[in-house]
UniProtKB/Swiss-Prot annotation:
Its EC number is 2.3.1.4. InterPro entries: Acyl_CoA_acyltransferase, GNAT_dom, GNPNAT1-like. It is a peripheral membrane protein. The keyword Membrane applies. Substrate binds at residues 61, 108-111, 120-122, 151-152, 175, 181. It comes from Mus musculus (Mouse). It comes from the Eukaryota. Its main location: Golgi. Belongs to the acetyltransferase family. GNA1 subfamily. It is an enzyme of class 2 (transferase). Ubiquitous. Shows a strong differential expression pattern in adult hematopoietic precursor cells. SUPFAM superfamilies: Acyl-CoA N-acyltransferases (Nat). This is Glucosamine 6-phosphate N-acetyltransferase.
């Protein structure tokens, strides 16, 4: 399989979020349909492998060495599950991915078999910080989780980032986030 423009999920979902429920302030005003001059907010596609997707992710954390075959296999798994909403911002003038964030839907037995949203891997490339793209991605995915009928949405962040997430009505939970790593 060769990389192409097939989206991970239906792009219309991003256009259908109820932007009137957005709680963040954008100055200048931007939105999922108008993210800024020369920018497009859309689902990840396999062609993004060659548009700097991993370069952007690498500014967040260690990505490791990922072969095109590994990327395609993971992409197809995520796409088929229907529960992964990897969203990117592309600078179409450069043909490069400049920001990304992921919404994962977790199916539960509690709350009458409800769904929980989880935000992961929010990162904006160094060159594009200050253009509100992180805010745009988080606002969009938060509203998308509501549209997808999640009973709540959660994320983990470093203490110094709590203030940023509070702008979106996220609150610090009394629960502790615990982790056990198997890979170094």
């Amino acid at each position: 399989m060769k990389p192409d423009e097939t989206p991970m999920f239906d792009p219309s979902l991003l256009k259908e979020v109820d932007w009137s429920q957005n709680t963040a302030i954008f100055s200048p005003a931007i939105s999922p349909t108008h993210p800024g001059e020369g920018l497009v907010l859309r689902p990840l596609c396999t062609a993004d492998l060659n548009k700097g997707f991993f370069k952007v992710l690498g500014q967040l954390t260690e990505t490791g060495v990922v072969s095109p075959e590994q990327f395609m296999k993971s992409f197809e798994h995520m796409k088929k599950s229907g529960d992964y909403y990897v969203t990117v911002v592309e600078d179409v003038t450069l043909g490069q991915i400049v920001a990304t964030a992921t919404l994962i839907i977790e199916h539960k037995f509690i709350h009458s078999c409800a769904k929980r949203g989880r935000v992961e891997d929010v990162v904006v490339s160094d060159e594009c910080r200050g253009k509100q793209l992180g805010k745009l991605l988080l606002s969009t995915l938060t509203l998308l989780s509501k549209k997808l009928n999640c009973y709540k949405i959660t994320l983990e962040c470093l203490p110094q980032n709590v203030g940023f997430y509070k702008k979106f009505d996220y609150t610090v939970s009394e629960e502790n986030y615990m982790c056990r790593r198997f890979l170094k």
